[in-house]
């Protein structure tokens, strides 16, 4: 047997085994009518059932998001907020900003320079927006009854199995869970954390969701739930009041938009920095020639450099109701601005942060969940929701069962200089004001081709979301990888400060291993990059509409859930 034939057979066997493994784990599915990709397969199925009953993508997003808040409470929930980009088939493109806000009694100097106070505890909690955001989008576009969409999460709250990934998050915050009565009542038994597969009961949250299902957001913002929530926060030393909840408003905006290599990319406007930063990176890289200019170790170097430029610019962004960000956003979407930045990229070496022109220090947001949905009519939803860090403020409201966010940690705060000239000052555009929304990295994205939905993509993973979402996009639309391979490819991250590239090198709780190849790392180090392995990163959810050449011309939806968190998509 010839060597060529032997190699061909071996490659075929490897490809077959990889495909069989993927099918067995259901990381990727192909469906024609509708598809839902979330961090947790239970929530993907709940969303799919909504679609099968005649609901649309917006309906499914409500049910799936509420589900995620129950079974993945370390990442998101009704105690947090969300950014949602929607494309209505043949119609509007809308961005729903249901980001948490600073309480009315919040001040720029409320933490006195004590960063721990804004990281956890009652003073770290922002006014939650998720319930209002879900209801507002549903009110405008939903088809099924609101109660029908809330009920599955209510039933799950009565009893759900702890996943391996949730257990990992519990382990990472063990001491804080034990220190909070609400969290320990939920996740601790006989002094030990409950194990994966254990049934977890949150009857208070089930009742809260029942009230929200019956009465809508007024139960949360101006009813029994709100009164109890405000009381619990006050008891713990917080400053959120019922008036804060009553004052909360969802902001409906136009998505950011950029035409890149024949596709139209829709993203979230400020206070998200994700949409503008991702478009800037794509505009820079698109000028190198596709795919050769972004391939191999040199392509990775160029990606890192583009990210460093984008992170330098993004800290000039903030809540547009408090800071004029018009020119900054215009620059970040401008191909000319991208061309100017590309000219500063040196293919032979990297530079220290000052070279990239950033004036301000970075914020390091955390956590989140992401879901992507495309329905039968080809309406699309891309939603990233969050309570910020693992279990948010590391406190659970005992009377409502709600895990509260620590979104105030995403604000910059004035700090005394420590004399380190390598660390720039905090960004004034992101300082605290009453009613202001903090800067975010969340990057829910919808891709259009000739005015029709081509893809919905996004990721969870805090400040790394920008790089993670961009890399999945690059892999598919620039490097022509299939959707599953685009998600499975190992990722690398850079946030400008600290000046190091973090690369995946870890084995997940599901025994998948992700690692940037050593050959790539060697090339990057020769160019001056400081590399640091990380056990984690981002979790992507990706749905692509394909032409459907194998299904009689009817378009197909290829949906992929990232195996890094163990989720799987569902569709029909």
Curated annotation (Swiss-Prot):
Glycans are attached at residues 171, 222, 505. The active site is at 368 (nucleophile). GO terms for biological process: glutathione catabolic process; response to oxidative stress. Keywords: Acyltransferase, Apoplast, Glycoprotein, Hydrolase, Secreted, Signal, Transferase. L-glutamate binds at residues 99, 386, 388, 407, 410, 440-441, 461-462. May play a role in preventing oxidative stress by metabolizing extracellular oxidized glutathione (GSSG). It comes from Arabidopsis thaliana (Mouse-ear cress). Its EC number is 3.4.19.13, 2.3.2.2. Expressed in embryo, roots and leaves. In mature plants, expression is restricted to vascular tissues of roots, leaves, flowers and siliques. Residues 552-572 are annotated as: Disordered. The lineage of its organism: Eukaryota, Viridiplantae, Streptophyta, Embryophyta, Tracheophyta. Induction: By glutathione. One of its GO terms (cellular component) is apoplast. This is Glutathione hydrolase 1. InterPro entries: GGT_lsub_C, GGT_peptidase, GGT_ssub, Ntn_hydrolases_N. Disruption phenotype: Slight reduction in size, early flowering and increased chlorosis in older leaves. Accumulation of GSSG in the apoplastic space.
């Amino acid at each position: 047997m010839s060597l060529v034939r032997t190699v061909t057979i071996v490659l075929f066997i490897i490809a077959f085994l990889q495909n069989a493994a993927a099918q067995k784990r259901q990381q990727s599915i192909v469906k024609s009518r509708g598809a839902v990709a979330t961090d947790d397969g239970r929530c993907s199925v709940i969303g799919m059932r909504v679609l099968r009953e005649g609901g649309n993508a917006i309906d499914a997003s409500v049910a799936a998001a509420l589900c995620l808040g129950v079974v993945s409470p370390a990442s998101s929930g009704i105690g947090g907020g969300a950014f949602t980009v929607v494309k209505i088939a043949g119609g509007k493109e809308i961005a729903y900003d249901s980001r948490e806000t600073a309480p009315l009694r919040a001040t720029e100097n409320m933490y006195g320079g004590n960063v721990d106070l804004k990281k956890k505890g009652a003073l770290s909690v922002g006014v939650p927006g998720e319930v209002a955001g879900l209801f507002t989008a549903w009110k405008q576009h939903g088809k099924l009854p609101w109660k029908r969409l809330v009920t599955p999460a209510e039933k799950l709250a009565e009893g759900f199995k702890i996943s391996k990934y949730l257990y990992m998050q519990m382990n990472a915050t063990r001491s804080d869970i034990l220190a909070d009565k609400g969290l320990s009542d939920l996740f601790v038994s006989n002094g030990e954390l409950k194990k994966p597969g254990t049934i977890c009961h949150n009857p208070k949250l089930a009742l809260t969701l029942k009230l929200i299902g019956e009465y809508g957001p007024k139960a949360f913002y101006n009813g029994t739930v709100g009164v109890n929530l405000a009381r619990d926060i006050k008891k713990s030393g917080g400053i959120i009041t019922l008036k804060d909840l009553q004052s909360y408003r969802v902001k409906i905006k136009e998505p950011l938009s950029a035409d890149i290599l024949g596709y139209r990319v829709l993203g979230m406007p400020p206070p998200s920095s994700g949409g503008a930063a991702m478009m800037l990176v794509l505009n820079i890289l698109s000028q190198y020639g596709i795919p050769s200019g972004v391939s191999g170790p040199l392509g990775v170097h160029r990606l890192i450099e583009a990210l460093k430029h984008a992170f330098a610019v993004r800290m000039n962004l903030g809540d547009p109701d408090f800071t004029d960000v018009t020119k900054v956003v215009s620059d970040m979407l401008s191909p000319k601005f991208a061309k100017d930045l590309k000219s500063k990229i040196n293919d032979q070496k990297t530079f220290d942060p000052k070279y990239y022109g950033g004036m301000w220090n970075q914020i390091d947001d955390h956590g989140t969940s992401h879901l992507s949905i495309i329905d039968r009519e080809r309406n699309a939803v891309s939603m990233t929701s969050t309570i910020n860090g693992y279990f948010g403020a590391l406190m659970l409201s005992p009377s409502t069962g709600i895990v509260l966010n620590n979104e105030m940690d995403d604000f910059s705060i004035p700090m005394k200089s420590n004399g380190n000239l390598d660390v720039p000052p905090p960004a004034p555009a992101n300082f605290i004001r009453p009613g202001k929304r903090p800067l975010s990295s969340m990057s829910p994205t919808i891709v259009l081709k000739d005015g029709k939905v081509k893809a919905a993509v996004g990721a969870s993973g805090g400040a790394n979301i920008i790089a993670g979402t961009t890399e999945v996009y690059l892999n598919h639309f620039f490097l022509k990888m299939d959707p599953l391979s685009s998600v499975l490819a190992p990722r690398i991250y850079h946030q400008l400060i600290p000046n190091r590239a973090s690369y995946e090198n870890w084995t997940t709780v599901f025994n998948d291993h992700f690692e940037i190849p050593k050959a790539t790392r060697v090339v990057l180090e020769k160019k001056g990059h400081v590399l640091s392995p990380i056990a984690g990163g981002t979790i992507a959810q990706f749905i692509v509409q394909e032409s459907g050449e194998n299904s009689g011309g009817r378009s197909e939806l290829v949906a992929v859930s990232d195996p890094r968190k163990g989720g799987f998509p569902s569709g029909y």
